[in-house]
């Protein structure tokens, strides 16, 4: 569970200026549990026993799991202790208006400074509820219960909250740690194949720039001779490995005072690909295209070897993730994306590219990316994506008939 305390500090007088000094110490737990809402599972009860709670849940999770979740609350908490709020979860609903709606619902339920917000759903719900928790009464506790693979390996371990504004993704938000994060992989059994692929993009990301064993575990799982499909449980060494590597990368730099972040691999061109497509591309799909283009650029610059570049494309291909969008990935559009990121990251693009599988490196400035090299990478990805489109037919990436559980 999270703790925040002020340590050390003091006050000094310098002429007419009073200087205040304080330091905050942050900590939070990411729990991986089975059967989180089984009647005999005590974890949520122990965390929330005496708290008043507003439980925010996505419509699809409410439809698929709502009765079981509500029964848990009926069993363990008094009726006046909690209230449910169903939140719309499209990118167009990831807005300050919905954050204010959460705050208004919390006020109407008389949630005080000791109250709790509980977020149950995918990344959009978690981001909005976290933002609301960070500003309601200047900050109350909240618990994250991610129900998507992206949520469990990425959003679960970080402290960022945010919503979209003026056509920009996550333009406003805060850094605010959850009181606790509760992962239950049972939720993934009702996740649609597309959402599973999006989560896999984030796991592949960590394998490519931080840990080659994550990448090879996924290769062994999805590629011949094993060739497992998405309905098979993912290798836990890859899932937990991605979470551990994510925490290791985030922990020394939770508030992003250093804007050189390996975890930003796949998150440079992808922001433009998502927004310009009107969010027709899901986040993980945009990340996959970004990773493919960044790997191709690294290869064009003579950094990433040809064999490893082919391995990267092969894994993305067999999982069923897109690697290129001809309509969106023009040289002008991708160069514009770099310029926008240059502003966002303090006039340094800090573009992460794979030097080899398991090791990332930075191209810090715009001048480190020759426009002609980017153009060559885009032309090559255009050709390779045609091969990818043909090979994907009948691959392990074919859609599975699953209910939507995002």
UniProtKB/Swiss-Prot annotation:
Residues given in the record as Zn(2+) binding sites: 202, 267, 283
SUPFAM superfamilies for the chain: Dehydroquinate synthase-like (SSF56796)
EC number: 4.2.3.152
Top-level taxon in the UniProt lineage: Bacteria
GO BP term, example: antibiotic biosynthetic process
GO molecular function, one term: nucleotide binding
Cofactor: NAD(+); Co(2+); Zn(2+)
Keyword terms: Cobalt, Lyase, Metal-binding, NAD, Nucleotide-binding, Zinc
Catalytic activity: D-sedoheptulose 7-phosphate = 2-epi-5-epi-valiolone + phosphate
Family annotation (InterPro entries): Dehydroquinate_synthase, DHQS/DOIS_N, DHQS_C, EEVS-like
CDD domains xrefs: EEVS
Enzyme kind, highest EC tier: lyase
Binding of NAD(+), residues: 91-94, 123-127, 147-148, 160, 169, 187-190
The keyword Methyltransferase is annotated on this UniProt entry: no
Family: Belongs to the sugar phosphate cyclases superfamily. EEVS-like family.
Biological role stated in the UniProt entry: Catalyzes the cyclization of D-sedoheptulose 7-phosphate to 2-epi-5-epi-valiolone.
Name by which UniProt lists this protein: 2-epi-5-epi-valiolone synthase
Lineage of the species this protein comes from: Bacteria, Pseudomonadati, Myxococcota, Myxococcia, Myxococcales
Gene this protein is translated from: gacC
């Amino acid at each position: 569970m999270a703790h925040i305390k002020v340590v050390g500090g003091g006050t000094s007088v310098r002429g007419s200026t009073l200087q205040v000094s304080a330091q905050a110490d942050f900590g939070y737990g990411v729990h991986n549990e089975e059967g989180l809402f089984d009647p005999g599972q005590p974890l949520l009860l122990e965390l929330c026993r005496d708290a008043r709670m507003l439980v925010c849940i996505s419509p699809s999770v409410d439809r698929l799991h709502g009765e079981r979740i509500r029964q848990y609350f009926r069993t363990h908490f008094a009726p006046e202790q909690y209230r449910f709020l169903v939140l719309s979860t499209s990118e167009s609903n990831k807005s300050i208006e919905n954050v204010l709606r959460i705050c208004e619902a919390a006020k109407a339920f008389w949630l005080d400074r000791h109250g709790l917000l509980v977020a149950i759903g995918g990344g959009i719900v978690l981001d909005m509820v976290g933002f609301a928790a960070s500003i309601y009464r200047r900050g109350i506790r909240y618990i994250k219960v991610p129900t998507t693979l992206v949520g469990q390996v990425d959003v679960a371990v970080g402290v960022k909250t945010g919503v979209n504004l003026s056509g920009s993704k996550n333009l406003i938000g805060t850094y605010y740690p959850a009181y606790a994060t509760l992962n239950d992989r049972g939720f993934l059994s009702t996740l649609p194949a597309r959402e599973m692929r999006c989560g896999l993009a984030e796991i592949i990301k960590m394998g490519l720039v931080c840990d080659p064993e994550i990448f090879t575990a996924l290769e062994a799982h999805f590629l011949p001779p094993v060739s497992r499909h998405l309905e098979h449980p993912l290798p836990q060494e890859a899932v937990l490995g991605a979470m551990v590597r994510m925490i290791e990368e985030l922990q020394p730099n939770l508030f992003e005072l250093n804007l050189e972040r390996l975890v930003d691999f796949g998150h440079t061109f992808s922001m433009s690909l998502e927004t310009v497509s009107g969010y027709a591309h899901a986040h993980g799909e945009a990340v996959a295209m970004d990773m493919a283009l960044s790997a191709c650029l690294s290869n064009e610059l003579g950094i990433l070897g040809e064999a490893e570049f082919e391995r990267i494309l092969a894994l993305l291909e067999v999982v069923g993730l897109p690697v290129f969008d001809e309509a969106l990935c023009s040289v002008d559009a991708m160069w514009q994306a770099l310029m926008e990121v240059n502003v966002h990251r303090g006039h340094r693009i800090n573009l992460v590219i794979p030097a080899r599988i398991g090791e990332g490196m930075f191209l810090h400035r715009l001048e480190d990316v020759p426009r002609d090299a980017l153009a060559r990478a885009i032309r090559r990805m255009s050709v390779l994506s045609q091969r990818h489109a043909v090979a994907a037919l009948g691959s392990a990436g074919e859609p599975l008939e699953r209910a939507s559980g995002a």
